[in-house]
Amino acid sequence: MTSWLSCFSPVSLAAGLLCCSPSTISAQELQAKITINHAQISGTEKGVFDNLQQTLQQFVNNRQWTHLQFQKNERIICNFNITVTKYDRDQNLFTCKALIQANRPVFHSAYTSTLYNNVDDNFTFRFAEYDQLEFNEQQIDNQLTALFAYYAYLIIGIDLDSFAPKGGEDILQRCMNLTNNAQNLDYPGWKAFADDRNRYAIISDYLDGALEPFRQLQYDYYRKGLDEMANNAERGRTEITAALETGLKKAKENRPLSLLPQIWTDFKKDELANIYRGKGTQKEKESIYELLFSINPSQNKYWDLVKE
Protein backbone atom coordinates (compact mmCIF):
# COMPACT_ATOMS: atom_id res chain seq x y z
CA MET A 1 0.00 0.00 0.00
CA THR A 2 1.75 3.12 -1.22
CA SER A 3 -0.98 5.71 -1.51
CA TRP A 4 -2.98 7.61 1.09
CA LEU A 5 -2.47 5.03 3.81
CA SER A 6 1.31 5.30 3.49
CA CYS A 7 1.17 9.06 3.98
CA PHE A 8 -1.49 8.94 6.71
CA SER A 9 -1.35 11.91 9.06
CA PRO A 10 -2.15 11.12 12.69
CA VAL A 11 -3.98 14.42 12.97
CA SER A 12 -5.98 14.47 9.77
CA LEU A 13 -7.56 11.77 7.69
CA ALA A 14 -8.32 14.29 4.97
CA ALA A 15 -4.65 15.04 4.46
CA GLY A 16 -4.09 11.43 3.52
CA LEU A 17 -6.91 11.50 1.03
CA LEU A 18 -5.11 14.19 -0.97
CA CYS A 19 -2.47 11.62 -1.89
CA CYS A 20 -4.93 9.65 -4.00
CA SER A 21 -4.97 9.77 -7.77
CA PRO A 22 -8.57 10.29 -8.95
CA SER A 23 -8.11 7.69 -11.66
CA THR A 24 -7.40 4.95 -9.11
CA ILE A 25 -9.93 5.88 -6.43
CA SER A 26 -12.57 3.35 -5.46
CA ALA A 27 -15.43 4.31 -3.19
CA GLN A 28 -15.85 0.91 -1.58
CA GLU A 29 -13.95 0.21 1.60
CA LEU A 30 -14.30 -3.57 1.93
CA GLN A 31 -13.22 -6.58 -0.06
CA ALA A 32 -15.19 -9.31 1.65
CA LYS A 33 -15.40 -13.00 0.98
CA ILE A 34 -18.66 -14.56 2.13
CA THR A 35 -18.77 -18.31 2.76
CA ILE A 36 -22.00 -20.15 3.58
CA ASN A 37 -21.49 -23.57 5.15
CA HIS A 38 -24.80 -25.46 5.01
CA ALA A 39 -23.45 -29.01 5.44
CA GLN A 40 -25.61 -29.46 8.55
CA ILE A 41 -28.79 -28.82 6.54
CA SER A 42 -30.12 -31.80 4.60
CA GLY A 43 -32.89 -32.13 2.05
CA THR A 44 -32.81 -28.50 0.93
CA GLU A 45 -32.09 -27.16 -2.52
CA LYS A 46 -28.72 -25.43 -2.35
CA GLY A 47 -29.92 -22.63 -4.63
CA VAL A 48 -31.09 -20.50 -1.70
CA PHE A 49 -27.66 -20.74 -0.06
CA ASP A 50 -25.85 -19.88 -3.28
CA ASN A 51 -28.16 -16.93 -3.83
CA LEU A 52 -27.64 -15.78 -0.23
CA GLN A 53 -23.86 -15.90 -0.67
CA GLN A 54 -23.92 -13.95 -3.93
CA THR A 55 -26.40 -11.38 -2.62
CA LEU A 56 -24.38 -10.75 0.54
CA GLN A 57 -21.07 -10.47 -1.27
CA GLN A 58 -22.51 -7.89 -3.65
CA PHE A 59 -24.18 -6.01 -0.79
CA VAL A 60 -21.00 -5.73 1.27
CA ASN A 61 -18.50 -5.10 -1.52
CA ASN A 62 -20.49 -2.80 -3.80
CA ARG A 63 -21.71 -0.42 -1.11
CA GLN A 64 -19.87 2.70 -0.04
CA TRP A 65 -20.14 2.54 3.75
CA THR A 66 -18.48 5.87 4.59
CA HIS A 67 -17.47 9.15 2.95
CA LEU A 68 -13.87 7.95 2.68
CA GLN A 69 -12.15 7.14 -0.59
CA PHE A 70 -10.11 3.94 -0.84
CA GLN A 71 -7.95 2.85 -3.73
CA LYS A 72 -8.74 -0.63 -4.97
CA ASN A 73 -5.61 -2.13 -3.41
CA GLU A 74 -6.42 -0.43 -0.08
CA ARG A 75 -9.77 -2.11 0.45
CA ILE A 76 -9.90 -3.99 3.73
CA ILE A 77 -9.71 -7.74 3.25
CA CYS A 78 -12.32 -9.47 5.40
CA ASN A 79 -14.05 -12.82 5.64
CA PHE A 80 -17.48 -13.84 6.85
CA ASN A 81 -17.65 -17.60 7.39
CA ILE A 82 -21.30 -18.35 8.13
CA THR A 83 -22.33 -21.79 9.38
CA VAL A 84 -26.04 -22.55 9.06
CA THR A 85 -27.13 -24.74 11.96
CA LYS A 86 -30.87 -24.62 11.24
CA TYR A 87 -32.97 -23.52 8.28
CA ASP A 88 -36.76 -23.07 8.35
CA ARG A 89 -37.81 -22.88 4.72
CA ASP A 90 -41.40 -21.92 5.53
CA GLN A 91 -40.27 -18.96 7.65
CA ASN A 92 -37.17 -18.18 5.54
CA LEU A 93 -35.31 -18.27 8.86
CA PHE A 94 -31.59 -19.01 9.05
CA THR A 95 -30.09 -19.86 12.44
CA CYS A 96 -26.34 -19.44 12.13
CA LYS A 97 -23.07 -18.62 13.76
CA ALA A 98 -20.45 -16.56 11.96
CA LEU A 99 -16.70 -16.17 12.15
CA ILE A 100 -15.77 -12.61 11.19
CA GLN A 101 -12.17 -11.83 10.34
CA ALA A 102 -10.44 -8.72 8.99
CA ASN A 103 -6.80 -8.28 8.00
CA ARG A 104 -4.39 -5.38 7.62
CA PRO A 105 -1.25 -5.32 5.45
CA VAL A 106 2.03 -4.41 7.10
CA PHE A 107 4.04 -1.69 5.37
CA HIS A 108 7.07 -2.68 3.28
CA SER A 109 6.17 -6.34 3.75
CA ALA A 110 4.12 -9.14 2.21
CA TYR A 111 2.82 -9.93 5.70
CA THR A 112 -0.79 -9.32 6.69
CA SER A 113 -1.85 -9.04 10.32
CA THR A 114 -5.24 -9.88 11.79
CA LEU A 115 -7.23 -6.81 12.83
CA TYR A 116 -10.30 -8.63 14.11
CA ASN A 117 -11.32 -12.25 14.54
CA ASN A 118 -14.32 -13.26 16.57
CA VAL A 119 -17.30 -15.61 16.48
CA ASP A 120 -20.84 -14.25 16.57
CA ASP A 121 -23.02 -17.06 17.92
CA ASN A 122 -26.23 -15.10 17.33
CA PHE A 123 -26.12 -14.69 13.56
CA THR A 124 -29.81 -15.37 12.92
CA PHE A 125 -31.80 -13.71 10.12
CA ARG A 126 -34.51 -14.10 7.50
CA PHE A 127 -33.81 -14.32 3.79
CA ALA A 128 -35.92 -15.51 0.87
CA GLU A 129 -34.26 -16.51 -2.38
CA TYR A 130 -33.84 -13.52 -4.72
CA ASP A 131 -34.48 -11.00 -1.95
CA GLN A 132 -32.93 -7.62 -2.73
CA LEU A 133 -31.05 -6.11 0.21
CA GLU A 134 -31.51 -2.44 0.99
CA PHE A 135 -30.03 -0.62 3.95
CA ASN A 136 -31.19 2.60 5.55
CA GLU A 137 -28.92 3.70 8.37
CA GLN A 138 -31.67 5.86 9.85
CA GLN A 139 -34.25 3.07 9.95
CA ILE A 140 -32.95 -0.30 11.12
CA ASP A 141 -35.73 -2.73 10.26
CA ASN A 142 -33.93 -5.63 8.56
CA GLN A 143 -31.81 -8.03 10.60
CA LEU A 144 -29.61 -9.26 7.75
CA THR A 145 -28.55 -5.82 6.53
CA ALA A 146 -28.13 -4.64 10.14
CA LEU A 147 -25.73 -7.51 10.85
CA PHE A 148 -23.49 -6.75 7.90
CA ALA A 149 -23.64 -2.99 8.40
CA TYR A 150 -22.59 -3.49 12.01
CA TYR A 151 -19.52 -5.47 11.03
CA ALA A 152 -18.73 -3.18 8.11
CA TYR A 153 -18.59 -0.17 10.44
CA LEU A 154 -16.73 -2.10 13.14
CA ILE A 155 -14.07 -3.35 10.73
CA ILE A 156 -13.59 0.01 9.02
CA GLY A 157 -13.39 1.78 12.39
CA ILE A 158 -10.80 -0.62 13.79
CA ASP A 159 -8.77 -0.35 10.58
CA LEU A 160 -8.73 3.45 10.81
CA ASP A 161 -7.72 3.23 14.48
CA SER A 162 -4.62 1.35 13.33
CA PHE A 163 -3.50 4.27 11.14
CA ALA A 164 -4.20 7.19 13.50
CA PRO A 165 -4.98 7.45 17.22
CA LYS A 166 -8.76 6.95 17.49
CA GLY A 167 -8.91 7.48 13.73
CA GLY A 168 -12.05 5.38 13.50
CA GLU A 169 -14.04 7.33 16.09
CA ASP A 170 -16.74 8.62 13.73
CA ILE A 171 -17.25 5.24 12.06
CA LEU A 172 -17.33 3.35 15.35
CA GLN A 173 -19.89 5.85 16.62
CA ARG A 174 -22.03 5.02 13.59
CA CYS A 175 -21.71 1.37 14.58
CA MET A 176 -22.91 2.25 18.08
CA ASN A 177 -25.82 4.28 16.70
CA LEU A 178 -26.84 1.35 14.51
CA THR A 179 -26.68 -0.96 17.52
CA ASN A 180 -28.88 1.37 19.55
CA ASN A 181 -31.37 1.56 16.69
CA ALA A 182 -31.36 -2.24 16.41
CA GLN A 183 -32.64 -2.69 19.98
CA ASN A 184 -36.16 -3.13 18.61
CA LEU A 185 -35.18 -6.02 16.33
CA ASP A 186 -36.53 -9.30 17.66
CA TYR A 187 -33.23 -11.16 17.34
CA PRO A 188 -30.54 -12.04 19.88
CA GLY A 189 -27.18 -10.29 20.02
CA TRP A 190 -28.26 -6.65 20.09
CA LYS A 191 -29.54 -6.18 23.62
CA ALA A 192 -27.65 -3.98 26.03
CA PHE A 193 -26.20 -5.79 29.04
CA ALA A 194 -27.62 -9.16 27.96
CA ASP A 195 -24.24 -10.72 27.21
CA ASP A 196 -20.69 -9.51 27.78
CA ARG A 197 -19.64 -10.74 24.33
CA ASN A 198 -22.59 -9.81 22.12
CA ARG A 199 -22.59 -7.10 19.46
CA TYR A 200 -23.73 -4.41 21.86
CA ALA A 201 -20.99 -5.26 24.37
CA ILE A 202 -18.24 -5.25 21.74
CA ILE A 203 -18.96 -1.80 20.28
CA SER A 204 -19.93 -0.31 23.65
CA ASP A 205 -16.56 -1.35 25.07
CA TYR A 206 -14.67 0.04 22.07
CA LEU A 207 -16.21 3.45 22.75
CA ASP A 208 -15.94 3.31 26.55
CA GLY A 209 -13.65 6.07 27.79
CA ALA A 210 -12.07 3.67 30.28
CA LEU A 211 -10.90 1.58 27.32
CA GLU A 212 -9.23 4.42 25.43
CA PRO A 213 -5.87 2.72 26.12
CA PHE A 214 -7.14 -0.24 24.09
CA ARG A 215 -7.98 2.10 21.21
CA GLN A 216 -4.52 3.65 21.45
CA LEU A 217 -3.04 0.15 21.42
CA GLN A 218 -4.36 -0.35 17.89
CA TYR A 219 -2.30 2.58 16.58
CA ASP A 220 0.80 1.93 18.66
CA TYR A 221 0.88 -1.79 17.89
CA TYR A 222 0.26 -1.62 14.14
CA ARG A 223 1.49 1.77 12.93
CA LYS A 224 4.41 2.32 15.31
CA GLY A 225 5.25 -1.34 15.85
CA LEU A 226 4.47 -3.76 13.03
CA ASP A 227 4.84 -1.17 10.26
CA GLU A 228 8.32 -0.38 11.58
CA MET A 229 9.57 -3.95 11.79
CA ALA A 230 10.48 -4.32 8.11
CA ASN A 231 12.83 -1.34 8.43
CA ASN A 232 14.10 -2.03 11.93
CA ALA A 233 12.88 -5.17 13.68
CA GLU A 234 14.42 -4.19 17.02
CA ARG A 235 12.79 -0.77 17.07
CA GLY A 236 9.45 -2.19 15.94
CA ARG A 237 9.46 -4.80 18.69
CA THR A 238 10.38 -2.16 21.26
CA GLU A 239 7.35 -0.12 20.19
CA ILE A 240 5.13 -3.21 20.43
CA THR A 241 6.42 -3.91 23.93
CA ALA A 242 5.62 -0.34 24.96
CA ALA A 243 2.16 -0.61 23.38
CA LEU A 244 1.37 -3.81 25.26
CA GLU A 245 2.72 -2.55 28.58
CA THR A 246 0.72 0.66 28.37
CA GLY A 247 -2.36 0.17 26.20
CA LEU A 248 -3.20 -3.47 26.82
CA LYS A 249 -2.24 -3.48 30.49
CA LYS A 250 -4.05 -0.22 31.24
CA ALA A 251 -7.20 -1.37 29.43
CA LYS A 252 -7.30 -4.52 31.56
CA GLU A 253 -6.77 -2.51 34.74
CA ASN A 254 -9.44 0.06 33.83
CA ARG A 255 -12.09 -2.45 32.79
CA PRO A 256 -11.19 -5.90 34.16
CA LEU A 257 -14.53 -7.39 33.04
CA SER A 258 -14.25 -6.27 29.43
CA LEU A 259 -13.54 -9.13 27.05
CA LEU A 260 -11.80 -6.98 24.42
CA PRO A 261 -8.27 -7.68 25.73
CA GLN A 262 -9.01 -11.41 25.87
CA ILE A 263 -10.52 -11.49 22.37
CA TRP A 264 -7.57 -9.51 21.02
CA THR A 265 -4.98 -11.81 22.57
CA ASP A 266 -6.93 -14.86 21.34
CA PHE A 267 -6.36 -13.89 17.72
CA LYS A 268 -2.92 -12.36 18.30
CA LYS A 269 -1.41 -15.36 20.10
CA ASP A 270 0.59 -16.73 17.16
CA GLU A 271 1.80 -13.31 16.08
CA LEU A 272 2.87 -12.30 19.57
CA ALA A 273 4.70 -15.58 20.11
CA ASN A 274 6.59 -15.08 16.85
CA ILE A 275 7.50 -11.48 17.69
CA TYR A 276 9.23 -12.44 20.94
CA ARG A 277 10.33 -16.05 20.47
CA GLY A 278 14.12 -16.05 20.43
CA LYS A 279 14.23 -12.25 20.38
CA GLY A 280 14.53 -9.45 22.90
CA THR A 281 15.98 -9.34 26.38
CA GLN A 282 14.99 -11.85 29.02
CA LYS A 283 13.54 -9.04 31.14
CA GLU A 284 11.38 -7.87 28.23
CA LYS A 285 10.19 -11.40 27.51
CA GLU A 286 9.33 -12.10 31.15
CA SER A 287 7.39 -8.85 31.40
CA ILE A 288 5.37 -9.60 28.27
CA TYR A 289 4.76 -13.19 29.37
CA GLU A 290 3.38 -12.09 32.74
CA LEU A 291 1.13 -9.50 31.11
CA LEU A 292 -0.29 -11.87 28.50
CA PHE A 293 -0.78 -14.67 31.03
CA SER A 294 -2.66 -12.32 33.38
CA ILE A 295 -5.04 -11.34 30.58
CA ASN A 296 -5.55 -14.70 28.89
CA PRO A 297 -4.20 -17.71 30.81
CA SER A 298 -6.05 -20.11 28.48
CA GLN A 299 -3.44 -19.39 25.79
CA ASN A 300 -0.48 -20.15 28.04
CA LYS A 301 1.14 -22.60 25.60
CA TYR A 302 1.65 -19.64 23.26
CA TRP A 303 2.86 -17.35 26.02
CA ASP A 304 5.42 -19.98 26.99
CA LEU A 305 6.93 -19.50 23.52
CA VAL A 306 7.44 -15.81 24.31
CA LYS A 307 9.99 -16.78 26.96
CA GLU A 308 12.06 -19.00 24.66
Q: What are these model-derived regions, one by one?
A:
Residues 164-257:
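Flexible, glycine-rich surface segments
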Residues 39-46, 134-142, 254:
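Second-shell loop/turn segments in exported
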Residues 28-95, 106-108:
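Start-of-domain marker
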Residues 57-65, 157-161, 273, 277:
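Sec-exported extracytoplasmic/periplasmic mature domains
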